[in-house]
C-alpha cells in the first residue's frame, strides 16, 4: 500500500474523530454533571442535521443553518432536562427508559416531517473540492471539520478552565452535592450543560450532514461511537473526549479500510483492553 493511502486514511480518521468530538464532548459533560445516560443524544445529531438542511435549503446560508440547528436543538434539550429528566434524578433505569422513548419519538417525528429519503446538507462552494498539502490531496470540507472541532475544543477548554462558569461546571462534575452545599445552583448548571451538549450534537449533525448525509436511523448509527469515545476517554473529561474521539476515528477508519470484515472488532477490542487496564477510562477519575 502506498504512502498516499496511509495519509488519506489517517486524515479521514482524524476528520471523522473531529466530528465525533462535537457529539461526544457534550455527552461526556452531561454525564459528568448529571450522571444521566442520555440515549437520545444521537437524536440531537439527527434532528440538528434535518433542521440545518431545512434552513440551508430555504436561506442558502450554511452558517445560518448551523446556528439555527444549534439553538433549536438546545431548546429541545433544555425542555427534556427541565420537564422530564430532572424528575428522574438518581433513577438510572427511569432515565434510560425515558431517553430511549424520546429517541424513538424523535425518529418517528423526523420520518413524519422529512420522510425516509436520505439528504445531503448543501455546503458553500468555498468548502468543496480538494487541496494539495505536502504532495497529498485532502478534501477541503474535511479540513473545515477538523478546524471547527479544534475551535470548539479550545473554546470549551477556555470556558471550563479559565472562567467562573467553568469552575462551577467542574465542581458539579467532581461532587454535585458538595457544589450545591457551597452555593452553586447545580440544577441551573445542569440545564446549561444539557443545552450546550444538545447544541454541539446538533452542530455536528449539520456539519456531518454535508458528507455523511441526513437520514432516519443516523441517530442510532452514530450513538454507539459517541459512547465508545466517552467510555474510552473517561466520563466527564473534556481531554478524554478529545483523545477518545481521535482514537475511535482512526481505529474505525483503518479497521474498515484494512479489515472490513473485522471493523467492529478493531474498534471495540481496544476499548475492552483500555477498560480492563483503566476501568475509569484514559482520563476518568474514580
Regions found by a protein language model. Give the residues of each.
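Membrane-embedded helix boundary and interhelical linker motif in transport proteins
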Residues: 11, 33-79, 83
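Transmembrane helix-bundle core of multi-pass membrane transporters
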Residues: 10, 87-162, 189, 254, ...
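Membrane-interfacial amphipathic/re-entrant helices at transmembrane-helix boundaries
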Residues: 1-22, 51, 62-64, 91-96, ...
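Cytosolic-side transmembrane-helix boundaries in multi-pass membrane proteins
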Residues: 5, 94, 113, 174-181, ...
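Short, non-helical or kinked segments that cap or interrupt transmembrane helices
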Residues: 25-49, 90-95, 165-168, 186, ...
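Transmembrane alpha-helical segments in multi-pass inner-membrane proteins
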Residues: 20, 60-71, 191-201, 205-271, ...
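Helix-loop-helix "hairpin" substructures at the membrane interface of multi-pass membrane proteins
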Residues: 16-17, 22, 136-214, 238-243
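Alpha-helical transmembrane segments within multi-pass membrane transporters and channels
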Residues: 60-103, 109, 243-248, 278-279
Amino acid at each position: 500500500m502506498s504512502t498516499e493511502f496511509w495519509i488519506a486514511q489517517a486524515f479521514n480518521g482524524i476528520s471523522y474523530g473531529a466530528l465525533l468530538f462535537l457529539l461526544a464532548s457534550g455527552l461526556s459533560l452531561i454525564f459528568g454533571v448529571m450522571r444521566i445516560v442520555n440515549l437520545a443524544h444521537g437524536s440531537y445529531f439527527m434532528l440538528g442535521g434535518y433542521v440545518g438542511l431545512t434552513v440551508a435549503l430555504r436561506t442558502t446560508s450554511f452558517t445560518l443553518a448551523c446556528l439555527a440547528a444549534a439553538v433549536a436543538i438546545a431548546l429541545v434539550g433544555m425542555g427534556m432536562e427541565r420537564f422530564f429528566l430532572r424528575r428522574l434524578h438518581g433513577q438510572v433505569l427511569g432515565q434510560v427508559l425515558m431517553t430511549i422513548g424520546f429517541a424513538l419519538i424523535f425518529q418517528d417525528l423526523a420520518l413524519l416531517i422529512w420522510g425516509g429519503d436520505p439528504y445531503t446538507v448543501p455546503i458553500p462552494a468555498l468548502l468543496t473540492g480538494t487541496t494539495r498539502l505536502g504532495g497529498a490531496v485532502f478534501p477541503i470540507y474535511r479540513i473545515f471539520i477538523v478546524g471547527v472541532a479544534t475551535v470548539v475544543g479550545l473554546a470549551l477548554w477556555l470556558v471550563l478552565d479559565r472562567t467562573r462558569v467553568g469552575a462551577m461546571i467542574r465542581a458539579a462534575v467532581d461532587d454535585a452535592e458538595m457544589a450545591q452545599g457551597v452555593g452553586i445552583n447545580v440544577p441551573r448548571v445542569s440545564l446549561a450543560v444539557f443545552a450546550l451538549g444538545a447544541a454541539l450534537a446538533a452542530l455536528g449533525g449539520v456539519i456531518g450532514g454535508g458528507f455523511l448525509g441526513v437520514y432516519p436511523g443516523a441517530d442510532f448509527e452514530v450513538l454507539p461511537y459517541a459512547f465508545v469515545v466517552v467510555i474510552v476517554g473517561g466520563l466527564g473529561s473534556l481531554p478524554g473526549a478529545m483523545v477518545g474521539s481521535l482514537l475511535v476515528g482512526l481505529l474505525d477508519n483503518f479497521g474498515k479500510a484494512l479489515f472490513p470484515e473485522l471493523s467492529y472488532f478493531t474498534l471495540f477490542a481496544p476499548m475492552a483492553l483500555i477498560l480492563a487496564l483503566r476501568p475509569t477510562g484514559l482520563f476518568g477519575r474514580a
